[in-house]
A protein has these predicted regions:
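Helix-turn-helix DNA-binding segment
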Residues: 150-190
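Conserved acidic segment of CheY-like receiver
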Residues: 10-24, 28-32, 41, 60, ...
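A short, hydrophobic beta-strand element within the central beta-sheet of small alpha/beta folds
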Residues: 84-96, 110
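Conserved phosphotransfer microenvironments
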Residues: 45-48, 58-78, 91-98
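Conserved phosphotransfer cores of two-component systems
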Residues: 53-55, 78-84, 105, 217
C-alpha cells in the first residue's frame, strides 16, 4: 500500500533563515517547503538576532557556522529573547562536541548539513515534526549526544522510573502524546503524567529540555529507531 503524501508545512508559520553559506541560504530560501513561510534571512549572528526580534518568527533555521558569530550562541540568545520560537540547527561538522553545543542551546531540531539534498528527508521530517510540536533528533544525532562527555552535569535528585524513561525516549524520537500512548499501550492521561514527572525530575521547562537532558544524561538508548 502506498503511503499518503505528507501535508505541506503549515503556511501560517513565520520562518527565518540564518546561514553563513550564502549558496545554501539561497537554495533553502526558494525551496518549496520553506519559501511560502519565509519572512527574512541573514548571514551573521548579530543580523540574525535583530531579524528575529523584528520579525517575531515561530521557527528559526540556522547553520552552526555563520559569516560572523556562531549558530549555537544565536540559538541561546533567541531562546532567551523569544522562547516561543522553535529552533532548528543545521550542523556543518558531525562531531560530538558540536552536537552537544546544539543540544545545550536546547535546539528543537538538529540535523547535519550532509543530509540536505540526499533524499534522506531530514529537513522535511524536521519541519513536519516541529510543526506538530515535537522535537527532531535523528538517530545519528542521538548517538553522538549520548557519546559526548558529560563532566558538568549535576547528579539527578531523583531517578526516573522505567515508564518515565520510555516516555522520554519517545519524546526524543519526535513522538507526540497520542503516538506515545499507542506505542506503550497506556492512556493519554498516563502519558501526560509520565511527561510531567520526567520534566520535574530532569529540571526541564518543556518537552525539548526534557528530551535534551535525558539524552545528555545517557538515560535513553540513542539507537532506538
Amino acid at each position: 500500500r502506498m503511503r499518503s503524501p505528507r501535508p505541506p508545512i503549515p503556511e501560517h508559520r513565520r520562518l527565518v533563515l540564518v546561514f553563513g553559506d550564502r549558496l545554501t541560504l539561497s537554495a533553502l530560501a526558494i525551496a518549496e517547503p520553506i519559501q511560502p513561510s519565509l519572512v527574512g534571512a541573514a548571514t551573521t549572528e548579530d543580523e540574525g538576532v535583530d531579524l528575529v526580534l523584528r520579525a517575531q518568527p515561530d521557527l528559526l533555521i540556522c547553520s552552526s557556522d555563520l559569516e560572523t558569530g556562531y549558530g549555537p550562541v544565536l540559538l541561546k540568545c533567541v531562546k532567551t529573547e523569544l522562547p516561543t520560537c522553535q529552533l532548528l540547527i543545521v550542523l556543518e561538522r558531525e562531531t560530538k562536541a558540536l552536537v552537544r553545543e546544539a543540544l545545550d542551546a536546547f535546539a528543537d531540531g538538529v540535523i547535519f548539513k550532509s543530509s540536505l539534498g540526499t533524499g534522506r528527508g531530514d529537513l522535511i521530517g524536521a519541519l513536519h515534526t516541529l510543526a506538530d510540536g515535537g522535537v527532531y533528533y535523528p538517530a545519528e544525532i542521538r548517538r553522538l549526544a549520548a557519546a559526548a562527555p558529560q563532566p558538568d552535569l549535576p547528579p539527578l535528585v531523583e531517578e526516573l522510573t522505567q515508564r518515565e524513561l520510555d516516555v522520554a525516549a519517545a519524546v526524543a524520537r519526535g513522538l507526540k502524546n497520542n503516538a506515545i500512548a499507542d506505542l506503550l499501550g497506556i492512556s493519554l492521561e498516563t502519558v501526560k503524567t509520565h511527561v510531567g514527572n520526567a520534566m520535574d525530575k530532569l529540571g526541564a521547562r518543556d518537552r525539548t529540555q526534557m528530551a535534551v537532558t535525558a539524552l545528555l544524561y545517557g538515560l535513553i538508548d540513542p539507537l532506538e529507531p
